[in-house]
Amino acid sequence: MTALSARMLTRSRSLGPGAGPRGCREEPGPLRRREAAAEARKSHSPVKRPRKAQRLRVAYEGSDSEKGEGAEPLKVPVWEPQDWQQQLVNIRAMRNKKDAPVDHLGTEHCYDSSAPPKVRRYQVLLSLMLSSQTKDQVTAGAMQRLRARGLTVDSILQTDDATLGKLIYPVGFWRSKVKYIKQTSAILQQHYGGDIPASVAELVALPGVGPKMAHLAMAVAWGTVSGIAVDTHVHRIANRLRWTKKATKSPEETRAALEEWLPRELWHEINGLLVGFGQQTCLPVHPRCHACLNQALCPAAQGL
């Protein structure tokens, strides 16, 4: 055997089976075998797909050609009470006579309609300040006594506290209200020229004026619907009818909950409607469920 043949034979043996003139595959070594096994395991492991981002559907006003850029998204309520529309129809039917105290003695009926606009607005605000924790009949009586003396910012500031107290008694918390009325009247004279503020934020900054009063003042005095005026009647009835997504503990919580779903065109009506309903039918104690058209629709009817 020649030296060349010997070298070829030795090289062929070192390459192993499959070597030769066409032999270009080597038997995989230990490292290659481990890599191949790892690749095989990867190929059989579950593939993790990237999560798809959730898409929110938004409705737009206008025609199809107007959808997209520049279109304003519609606000669609995510929750509303069950049967609320039928309940509202029934309450309107029960209130169609408009013979509750609020219908004749409420804020809309306490001011002098012949007085100048500025004076009318002041009288509206004053009647609201007196109405807190007070029946409509008592508030109306106090307003009549005040108007008989000429109810203006100047006349109130010229009236001593003792006399003012006698005029507004027996409204609830009359002593505190004497102080608040005097303080608020002084602010109106100094900063608003005897008129009342035209915004909720400025109204609630006045002594003795809360959110319910502010929203009613905006509606009655300025003709602007700024929010739902929620008193104890509206608060109680909204919770009994489950008109709030969860039970609320205060009128302000109730206002925020109602404004989330109740159509804005109903915001002003709902106060007088529910106040009268609460005065006549849905009473705080011993409500007259047997006479209520919503007895079968009211979640609280069975437990009262």
From Swiss-Prot:
Residues spanned by motif Bipartite nuclear localization signal: 28-52
Subcellular location, record wording: Nucleus; Mitochondrion
Free-text activity regulation comment from the record: APE1 displaces NTHL1 from the N-glycosylase-generated AP site in DNA, thereby increasing the turnover of the DNA N-glycosylase activity. AP lyase activity is stimulated by YBX1. ERCC5/XPG stimulates NTHL1 activity and NTHL1 binding to its DNA substrate.
A Pfam family this chain is assigned to: HhH-GPD
Skewed-composition ranges (Basic residues): 43-55
CDD domains from the UniProt entry: ENDO3c
Cofactors: [4Fe-4S] cluster
Primary site of residence: nucleus
Highest taxon in the source lineage: Eukaryota
Compositional bias per record (Basic and acidic residues), positions renumbered to this chain: 23-42
Cell membrane keyword on record: no
Region feature (Disordered): 1-72
GO molecular function, one term: double-stranded DNA binding
Protein residues bound to [4Fe-4S] cluster: C282, C289, C292, C298
Enzymatic reactions: 2'-deoxyribonucleotide-(2'-deoxyribose 5'-phosphate)-2'-deoxyribonucleotide-DNA = a 3'-end 2'-deoxyribonucleotide-(2,3-dehydro-2,3-deoxyribose 5'-phosphate)-DNA + a 5'-end 5'-phospho-2'-deoxyribonucleoside-DNA + H(+)
GO cellular component: mitochondrion; nucleoplasm; nucleus
Site (Important for catalytic activity): D231
GO biological processes: base-excision repair, AP site formation; depyrimidination; nucleotide-excision repair
Statement: the UniProt record of this protein carries the keyword RNA-binding: no
Cofactor note: Binds 1 [4Fe-4S] cluster. The cluster does not appear to play a role in catalysis, but is probably involved in the proper positioning of the enzyme along the DNA strand.
Family stated for the protein in its record: Belongs to the Nth/MutY family.
Function: Bifunctional DNA N-glycosylase with associated apurinic/apyrimidinic (AP) lyase function that catalyzes the first step in base excision repair (BER), the primary repair pathway for the repair of oxidative DNA damage. The DNA N-glycosylase activity releases the damaged DNA base from DNA by cleaving the N-glycosidic bond, leaving an AP site. The AP-lyase activity cleaves the phosphodiester bond 3' to the AP site by a beta-elimination. Primarily recognizes and repairs oxidative base damage of pyrimidines. Also has 8-oxo-7,8-dihydroguanine (8-oxoG) DNA glycosylase activity.
Subunit structure: Interacts with YBX1. Interacts with ERCC5/XPG; the interaction stimulates NTHL1 activity and NTHL1 binding to its DNA substrate.
The protein, known as: Endonuclease III-like protein 1
Protein species of origin: Homo sapiens (Human)
Name of the coding gene: NTHL1
